[in-house]
């Protein structure tokens, strides 16, 4: 079968969710949690076919009896055995494809250590026998998905937040900034402030409930102090949420106090700058001639940028930091939760990209180091 007829696979491995599918599609076919679960107790039902590990949604649904681990922390793979399980699950259970028949485009965090790219490359060629592969930087793909080649991407997922300035399709590594504050930290913070209200959430299973509350009810206030005043003086901002056991809880100012930590990391006891300042600092590390293009093409990407009100707040905060005459445009595509994957789907289906793949033959000749020469 000719190389041209085979759809490439696009796999975006995030700290929280894995997004996978076929190049040319407009959305990923499979989206599942990047988790591997192992039973906490010895099985007693012989012949029940209990497995020694579960991946993704199955691990999620059996979370009550499992210990859940995330192999990707802060955007970077830290446990390769579990990562291999996630890839195996992606190919064979989710996409139901034979990896040796398809080129594979993987994504990586900005500033991913060199050894990690090599390890990814090695596993793809040696364990899964893929015919060809490529590794692309997540934020760059998000920018492609928005139809741009120049701009600054604020990519905030579950494990890490990055600001990545990109000029004519190339990320500018000296100006990339990383903030170890993302969705998982906000979920933990939400657990903490709900405890103050008298609701107790402690286990890994309960954390998932809190994550759902966060995703459904939180929003970013345009003016935090003013919103706190409104919340204190009326119940207009209160919402209720039904827990799996039928108990109904009410939340008020937690709805916007939780994501406010993105702008004020001191809420989490962190000394870092907020996402608005980090974006500004990233722009200021770039050449003075390209800053205008970055201010006017600030693209939001990733699940933790999905809060209602976040774009308006970013606009307000960056306008306060930037020169007064500067035109500032915050782009918040509705599909930004999946824009990294969508960008990968676009890239892998371009005819001009086909010569960019690292082939099995090149890998066999040069070894894992080939990835640094071909993927930049």
UniProtKB/Swiss-Prot annotation:
Please give the GO cellular component terms listed in this UniProt entry: cytoplasm; cytoskeleton
Q: Does the keyword Transmembrane apply?
A: no
Record's protein name = Actin-1
Subcellular location, in the record's words? Cytoplasm, Cytoskeleton
Q: Which SUPFAM superfamilies match?
A: Actin-like ATPase domain (SSF53067)
GO MF annotation list:
ATP binding; hydrolase activity
- The Enzyme Commission number assigned here is 3.6.4.-
Main subcellular localization, coarse class? Answer: cytoplasm
Q: Which domain of life is it from?
A: Eukaryota
Is Repressor there in the keyword field? no
Q: What does this protein do?
A: Actins are highly conserved proteins that are involved in various types of cell motility and are ubiquitously expressed in all eukaryotic cells.
Q: Which InterPro entries match?
A: Actin (IPR004000), Actin/actin-like_CS (IPR020902), Actin_CS (IPR004001), ATPase_NBD (IPR043129)
Family according to the record: Belongs to the actin family.
Cite the entry's keywords alphabetically: ATP-binding, Cytoplasm, Cytoskeleton, Hydrolase, Nucleotide-binding
**One Pfam family linked to the record:** Actin
Quote the PROSITE patterns the UniProt record gives: ACTINS_1 (PS00406), ACTINS_2 (PS00432), ACTINS_ACT_LIKE (PS01132)
Record field: catalytic activity: ATP + H2O = ADP + phosphate + H(+)
Q: What class of enzyme is it?
A: hydrolase
Q: Which organism is it from?
A: Schistosoma mansoni (Blood fluke)
């Amino acid at each position: 079968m000719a190389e041209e007829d085979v759809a490439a696979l696009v796999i975006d491995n995030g700290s929280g969710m894995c997004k996978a599918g076929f190049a040319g599609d407009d959305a990923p076919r499979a989206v599942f949690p990047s988790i591997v679960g192992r039973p906490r107790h010895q099985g007693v039902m012989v012949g029940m076919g209990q497995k020694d590990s579960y991946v993704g949604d199955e691990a999620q649904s059996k979370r009550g009896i499992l210990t859940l681990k995330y192999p990707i922390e802060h955007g970077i793979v830290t446990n390769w055995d579990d990562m291999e399980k996630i890839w195996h699950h992606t190919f064979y259970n989710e996409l139901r494809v034979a990896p040796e028949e398809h080129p594979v485009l993987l994504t990586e965090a900005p500033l991913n250590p060199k050894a990690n790219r090599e390890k990814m490359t090695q596993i793809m060629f040696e364990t899964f026998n893929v015919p060809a592969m490529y590794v692309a930087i997540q934020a760059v793909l998000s920018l492609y998905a928005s139809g741009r080649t120049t701009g600054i991407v604020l990519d905030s997922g579950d494990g890490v937040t990055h600001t990545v300035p990109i000029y004519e399709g190339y990320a500018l590594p000296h100006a990339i900034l990383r903030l170890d504050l993302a969705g998982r930290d906000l979920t933990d913070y939400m657990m903490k402030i709900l405890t103050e209200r008298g609701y107790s959430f402690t286990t890994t299973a309960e954390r998932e409930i809190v994550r759902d509350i966060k995703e459904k009810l939180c929003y970013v206030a345009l003016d935090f102090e003013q919103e706190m005043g409104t919340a204190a003086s009326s119940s207009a901002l209160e919402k209720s949420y039904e827990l799996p056991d039928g108990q109904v809880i009410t939340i008020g100012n937690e709805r916007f106090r939780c994501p406010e930590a993105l702008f004020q990391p001191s809420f989490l006891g962190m000394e870092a700058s907020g996402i608005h300042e980090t974006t500004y600092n990233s722009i200021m590390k770039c050449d003075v001639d390209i800053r205008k293009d970055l201010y006017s093409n600030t693209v939001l990407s990733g699940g933790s940028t999905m809060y209602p009100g976040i774009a308006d707040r970013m606009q307000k905060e960056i306008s306060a930091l930037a020169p007064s005459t500067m035109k500032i445009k915050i782009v918040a595509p509705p599909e930004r939760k999946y824009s990294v994957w969508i960008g990968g789907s676009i890239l892998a289906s371009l005819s001009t990209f086909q010569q960019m793949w690292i082939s099995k033959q090149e890998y066999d000749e040069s070894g894992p180091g080939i990835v640094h020469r071909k993927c930049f």
